[in-house]
């Protein structure tokens, strides 16, 4: 783990997650194993959004130039990142089309057609799509992509600012719970004015801390106020018969949550996957001794059948040495392995190996389902607690704003530095001086701080 970046790039390939050899910078391929991790992670966020009365929808990827340019601050914020389509075949287009960097403009253009009276509100929709940003900084697989393959963007419209404010809190809770379920600890900051989402009133951001001590923004919640509503004329008739503009929020996560699960939970042997997103939660490995293969294989099939409706279980019956199988599944981060040899079977025992702690222990076969139940919970908690300890060890609270102190801490301890909030230093000049990013203002242990870090 000394060279985290090397470890990270290697694991994407050796664990069969992602192939970055695609011949276009900032783009890569989700391999089947990685695709399953992505699928289970985004199934979790889908469940949570649906649970919270959001509706999934789907909007076009192509945005006509005049539509994208409609909200001044927004287009200014994205003009250096937008990809343009200029031809249909050999025919030049009369209006060039943007590949969506994000979908405020197409969605709010349609909302104008949907919103007439206050009872048409609230609207709470989301889509999980690819989006495109011509990132000029260092691109990194699943971290800084030019084609963001898994861009979950939610957009809401409300009839009062109080309701929009409440929706921001709801979104923050959804993300907090989601990142918790992924075992990824985060620090929440309100981004500074100079680094908020283009066109937003304010931006709340979730940052996690990678093993190399750099932070990464893995989710954002924006209160858009009425900026976009005024630009897109999202006007509605109020209950009193008057007129008002809608109050909006939007919030997004991306492939970065996949990168975080890999980065925060992995170790020298490879991935350690939270059971919720593991493509295979349990691997059954029959130990085939000469002349006794049948016993182990039959028992393995029996156990497979007894588990397959409850867990994502795989029977590894490849004709290779057990040790090779053990290494493969430790590399791929399968949470639980069940080994069974003829002697175990005679004694009605099974050997369990848990990837998160590396422990190996015997259990009674009749007790398997109960054991697995408690084991899955224990693994989830252990993975989460380990990550929490690592992230906590990367947080330093200073009781002063001394620039050298801050720089010293960032270069030695790394991670996040919290200094007492003071509006006089909450400036871009200060950010220049410390040669790091001001993440924003952060509540920590009930106090208000300015959070500072080197970021991805
Ligand atoms: N180039 C990128 N590669 C991967 N993820 C990215 C990239 N750019 C942004 N993200 C992720 O996408 C999230 C949402 O992007 S954003 O610009 O902050 N917010 C929006 O686009 C709003 N429309 C809410 S979806 C960010 O918090 C970040 O985690």
From Swiss-Prot:
CDD domains recorded: ProRS_core_arch_euk (cd00778)
Chain segments annotated as coiled-coil in the UniProt record: none
A family per Pfam: HGTP_anticodon
Domain of life (superkingdom): Archaea
GO cellular component: aminoacyl-tRNA synthetase multienzyme complex; cytoplasm
Molecular-function GO terms, alphabetical: ATP binding; proline-tRNA ligase activity
UniProt keywords, alphabetically: Aminoacyl-tRNA synthetase, ATP-binding, Cytoplasm, Ligase, Nucleotide-binding, Protein biosynthesis
InterPro entries referenced in this protein's UniProt entry, alphabetically: aa-tRNA-synt_IIb, aa-tRNA-synth_II, aa-tRNA-synth_II/BPL/LPL, Anticodon-bd, Anticodon-bd_dom_sf, Pro-tRNA-ligase_IIa, Pro-tRNA-ligase_IIa_arc-type, Pro-tRNA_synth_II
EC number: 6.1.1.15
GO biological process: prolyl-tRNA aminoacylation
Catalytic EC class: ligase
Subcellular compartments: Cytoplasm
Catalytic activity: tRNA(Pro) + L-proline + ATP = L-prolyl-tRNA(Pro) + AMP + diphosphate
Domain remark from Swiss-Prot or TrEMBL: Consists of three domains: the N-terminal catalytic domain, the anticodon-binding domain and the C-terminal extension.
Protein role: Catalyzes the attachment of proline to tRNA(Pro) in a two-step reaction: proline is first activated by ATP to form Pro-AMP and then transferred to the acceptor end of tRNA(Pro).
Subunit composition and interactions: Homodimer.
Annotated family: Belongs to the class-II aminoacyl-tRNA synthetase family. ProS type 3 subfamily.
Name under which the protein is recorded: Proline--tRNA ligase
